[in-house]
UniProtKB/Swiss-Prot annotation:
This is Glycerol-3-phosphate dehydrogenase [NAD(P)+]. Its EC number is 1.1.1.94. Its main location: cytoplasm. The gene is gpsA. It is an enzyme of class 1 (oxidoreductase). Disulfide bonds: none annotated. The lineage of its organism: Bacteria, Pseudomonadati, Pseudomonadota, Alphaproteobacteria, Hyphomicrobiales. Sn-glycerol 3-phosphate binds at residues 107, 135, 190, 243, 253-255. The active site is at 190 (proton acceptor). Keywords: Cytoplasm, Lipid biosynthesis, Lipid metabolism, NAD, NADP, Nucleotide-binding, Oxidoreductase, Phospholipid biosynthesis, Phospholipid metabolism.
Length: 327
């Protein structure tokens, strides 16, 4: 079935998604951005060297800087950062067609409320079905056509399977799910754990410590997901374990690099912190975990380090001297 698809957000991930969907050749795809000058350059040059250097964008991909460009789209992907999604919903909501499905592609939690992004978008766009795309996929890999698999979750499997069929391509495979909670929390919490792994690398503590963080972090993630109503199996899939392994081990990860800088004791740019999804998610997840009475010591430590309330050496000592327990 052919779909009309709009991708809102002309950063690296939005551009990569638009390109790979357009290359599949089954749907008309428009990349929508806010900067008319950038959109004009993309249309003329078919290159977005600022974020995807040297990657030629397909001739079939359309571009627009106008909000009404989404009017005819049956599927609209929101590919801007998590904290900008509410504003995007208000800006683009009036132009959505009646039956459009909105897919959030960000990996975060709404900072002001602690809401999941699907909850926030349902609040802002109550007449539309809301889905989430998440999993282990870097923008550059997707845009280069390197094999990538991610998860897409909707409230019902029929919608999730339709979206997976519409968005998947020869090198980009989506797996359908009806666990929006688990898919979203996996994407948000793995960013926090990636910062922790970066701190370990920056401190030179060793690969054994990184492996322990990944394993125990996955346990934290599972406890939190189940407490929020998600499924433990989702945590062991692409949007949980898969994304965690990728983000915690690859230097393409902004969250890992941020953690490395913290671990080395480097002064981090406040702007850099504002762009790191895990920096937002850490404090929100720590607060929510306390409310839910869920034990998340790694997340708590990352939140305290970022907020300047805990020294890294103290955090390591606290984690290693916690009461012995079963796995």
């Amino acid at each position: 079935m052919s779909e009309n698809i709009a991708v809102v957000g002309s950063g690296a991930f939005g551009t990569a998604l638009a390109a790979v969907i357009a290359l599949a050749g089954r749907s008309a795809v428009t990349l929508v951005g806010r900067d008319p000058s950038l959109i004009a350059d993309l249309k003329a040059e078919r290159l977005h060297d600022a974020v995807l250097p040297g990657i030629l964008l397909p001739d079939t991909l359309e571009f627009s800087a106008e909000a009404d460009a989404i009017t005819g789209a049956s599927i609209v992907l929101f590919a801007m950062p998590s904290q900008a999604q509410a504003d995007a919903a208000r800006q683009y909501g009036p132009y959505l067609c009646k039956d459009a499905v909105v897919v959030t592609c960000a990996k975060g939690i709404e900072r002001a409320t602690g809401n999941l992004l699907t909850d926030m978008l349902e609040r802002e766009l109550p007449d539309h079905s809301i889905a989430v795309l998440s999993g282990p996929g870097f923008a550059a890999d997707i845009a280069k056509g390197l094999p990538t698999a991610m998860a897409i979750a909707a409230a019902d499997m029929e919608t999730a399977e339709r979206l997976a069929q519409a968005i998947s391509g020869r090198t980009f495979r989506l797996y359908a799910s009806n666990d929006r909670i688990g898919v979203q929390l996996g994407g948000a919490l793995k960013n926090v754990l990636a910062i922790a792994c970066g701190i370990v690398e920056g401190r030179g503590i060793g690969d054994s410590a990184r492996a322990a963080l990944i394993a125990r972090g996955l346990a934290e993630m599972s406890r939190f997901v189940v407490a929020k109503g998600g499924q433990a199996d989702t945590v062991r899939g692409l949007s949980g374990l898969g994304d965690l392994v990728l983000t915690a081990t690859s230097h393409q990860s902004r969250n890992l690099r941020f953690g490395i800088a913290l671990g080395r004791g480097e002064k981090t740019d406040p702007l850099q912190g504002a762009l790191v999804e895990g920096a937002f998610a850490a404090s929100v997840a720590s607060r929510l975990a306390a409310e839910l009475k869920v034990s998340m010591p790694i997340t708590d430590a990352v939140s305290a380090i970022i907020d300047g309330k805990l020294d890294i050496s103290e955090a390591i000592e606290q984690l290693m001297t916690r009461p012995i327990t079963t796995e």
